[in-house]
């Protein structure tokens, strides 16, 4: 019995040594968007923000307000896709835009019925992208309706993409961690996500590892067109990572990091 315990202990030690030394430095937390200096250019790219929303009336007043009040001085428009909500999500959204005097920056898109072969969120997002494409933006920001964005988040994302010639920039936002179970499970989730997708490898063009965090993805319009649009991941189980893999597989450059100032409002 003692020999078995010793063997298992040594095996665990070898595995952890391998992970620590050769598995993409997954424990590192230095891939943070806020650590990048914000550079202001005279001419900034245009951005269309696409927000799929279904029965999000309780969080829209916070999340949409944070988007409308971004300090990004370039041209940006928000397309909120109302995915057949029954709680007045669209009305709340219009009220928020009116309250902050930003009605010119918000367009409401009413989602059509879900076709065969699509997941609900991706279908809503695809409709938003299609409508936003009429403006031929340089970038799309794909973000969830339950994300409260730091006032400079869009500026940081665009600066990161432009300064490093990236096709896709994504951040894992700071997840809500208040209840007992959230405090127990959320840190473990982030830890194991980084173990599965070491950010050092994701951000290395020479590595095939690809990942993104679906709550906040900035993608260049041309890169999205090159891979065939969102329809190529319409049935993907992990759509955010599938999108990142499609971009990287088509010789695109991607970056994934953490954010400490942009947060998720959703309880877990």
Question: Where are each of the predicted segments found?
Answer:
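Active-site nucleotide-sugar/metal-binding loop of Leloir-type enzymes
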Residues: 123-139
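Short beta-strand-to-loop acidic/aromatic patch adjacent to the donor-nucleotide binding site
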Residues: 136-148
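N-terminal membrane-anchoring/stem segments of glycan-assembly enzymes
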Residues: 1-41, 186-187, 199
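Acidic donor-binding segment of Leloir-type glycosyltransferases
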Residues: 64-114
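Catalytic donor/gating beta->alpha subdomain of glycosyltransferases that bind UDP-sugars
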Residues: 161, 168-194, 222-268
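Cell-envelope/extracellular polymer assembly enzymes that use nucleotide-activated donors
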Residues: 45-48, 77
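Short, well-formed alpha-helical segments that are part of the catalytic scaffolds
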Residues: 28-35, 56-69
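Acceptor/aglycone-binding surface of glycosyltransferases and processive sugar-polymer synthases
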Residues: 113-127, 158-159, 163-218, 222-223
């Amino acid at each position: 019995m003692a020999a078995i315990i010793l063997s298992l202990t040594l095996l665990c030690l070898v595995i952890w040594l391998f992970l620590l030394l050769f598995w993409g430095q997954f424990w590192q937390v230095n891939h943070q968007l806020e650590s990048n200096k914000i550079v202001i250019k005279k001419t900034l790219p245009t951005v269309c923000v696409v927000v799929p929303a279904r029965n999000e009336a309780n969080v829209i007043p916070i999340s949409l307000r944070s988007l409308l009040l971004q300090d990004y001085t370039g041209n940006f428009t928000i397309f909120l896709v109302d995915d057949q909500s029954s709680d007045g999500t669209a009305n709340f959204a219009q009220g928020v835009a009116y309250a902050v005097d930003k009605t010119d920056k918000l367009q409401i898109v009413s989602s059509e019925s879900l076709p065969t072969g699509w997941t609900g969120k991706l279908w809503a997002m695809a409709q938003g992208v299609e409508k936003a494409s009429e403006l031929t933006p340089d970038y799309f920001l794909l973000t969830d309706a339950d994300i409260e964005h730091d006032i400079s988040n869009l500026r940081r994302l665009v600066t990161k993409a432009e300064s490093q010639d990236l096709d896709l920039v994504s951040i894992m936002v700071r997840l809500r961690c208040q209840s007992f179970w959230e405090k127990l499970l959320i840190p473990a989730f982030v830890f194991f996500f980084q173990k599965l997708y070491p950010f050092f490898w994701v951000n290395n063009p020479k590595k095939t590892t690809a990942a993104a965090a679906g709550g906040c993805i900035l993608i260049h319009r041309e890169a999205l067109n090159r891979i065939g649009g969102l329809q190529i991941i319409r049935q993907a189980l992990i759509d955010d990572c599938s999108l990142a893999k499609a971009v990287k597989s088509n010789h695109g450059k991607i970056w994934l990091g953490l954010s400490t100032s942009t947060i998720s409002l959703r309880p877990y």
